């Protein structure tokens, strides 16, 4: 057991999908994994291990925001030996060419958080994806015929931001979308020398306000990113 995860050693696979929403973790386990067993219910942050196409994989919720994903990802890496971590979550488009239900693969993650500068006050440490996972995910998504964007995202500490116009301006600099976790995940992966990738589905748009989705859709659909994430985890 770790502080926030009740699993025993061996309960968690060395490769894992990390949705923010624990109910999305439950959905993935019930709809994509065979012989899924729940290994965590602490704080209702559900985690499951099963098999996907014969490969042992896990899925677990992380909650919202960088502090929350930092807790769960660190314990998964340090206490349970997880080596591949793929975030599957939602994001808001910052770019007029990136639309609702399309995929974004976060090649890198800018951030307005001080979570990394607490460790490196003299540096702007770049948070980047593992290239092998990124490359595999891109080709898997394209082979599925999914509209997929690759590039920088913004990991924000604030959902209801007072810097709306600044965030929009980032879209003009090539930033694809805004979300709340990728930078912290990539930083932990660099710190512990494991592989990480963030795959997001666009759930709404800051530049095309007529594009949005319901809370139920966000929980129970968006299966494209789940398929890409699972296929990427088991790819040779």
From Swiss-Prot:
Keywords: Glycosyltransferase, Transferase. GO terms for biological process: purine nucleoside catabolic process. A purine D-ribonucleoside binds at residues 4, 179-181, 203-204. The active site is at residue 204. InterPro entries: DeoD-type, Nucleoside_phosphorylase_CS, Nucleoside_phosphorylase_d, Nucleoside_phosphorylase_sf. One of its GO terms (molecular function) is purine-nucleoside phosphorylase activity. Catalyzes the reversible phosphorolytic breakdown of the N-glycosidic bond in the beta-(deoxy)ribonucleoside molecules, with the formation of the corresponding free purine bases and pentose-1-phosphate. Homohexamer; trimer of homodimers. Belongs to the PNP/UDP phosphorylase family. NCBIfam families: deoD (TIGR00107), PRK05819.1 (NF004489). This is Purine nucleoside phosphorylase DeoD-type.
């Amino acid at each position: 057991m770790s502080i926030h995860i009740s699993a025993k050693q061996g309960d968690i696979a060395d490769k894992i999908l990390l949705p923010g929403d624990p109910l999305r973790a439950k959905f993935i386990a019930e709809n994509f994994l065979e012989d899924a067993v729940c290994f965590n219910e602490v704080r209702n942050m559900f985690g499951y291990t099963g098999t996907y196409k014969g490969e042992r994989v896990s899925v677990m919720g992380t909650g919202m925001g960088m502090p929350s994903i930092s807790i769960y990802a660190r314990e998964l890496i340090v206490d349970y030996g997880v080596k591949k971590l793929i975030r599957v979550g939602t994001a808001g488009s910052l770019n007029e060419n990136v639309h609702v239900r399309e995929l974004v693969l976060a090649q890198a993650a800018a951030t307005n958080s001080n979570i990394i500068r607490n460790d490196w006050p003299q540096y702007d440490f770049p948070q980047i994806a593992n290239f092998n996972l990124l490359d595999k995910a891109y080709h898997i998504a394209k082979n599925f015929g999914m509209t997929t964007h690759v590039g920088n995202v913004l990991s924000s500490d604030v959902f209801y931001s007072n810097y709306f116009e600044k965030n929009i301006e980032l879209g003009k600099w090539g930033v694809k979308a805004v979300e709340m976790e990728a930078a912290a995940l990539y930083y932990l992966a660099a710190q512990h020398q494991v592989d990480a990738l963030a795959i997001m589905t666009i759930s709404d748009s800051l530049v095309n306000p007529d594009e949005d989705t319901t809370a139920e859709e966000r929980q129970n659909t968006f299966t494209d990113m789940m398929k890409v994430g699972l296929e990427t985890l088991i790819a040779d």
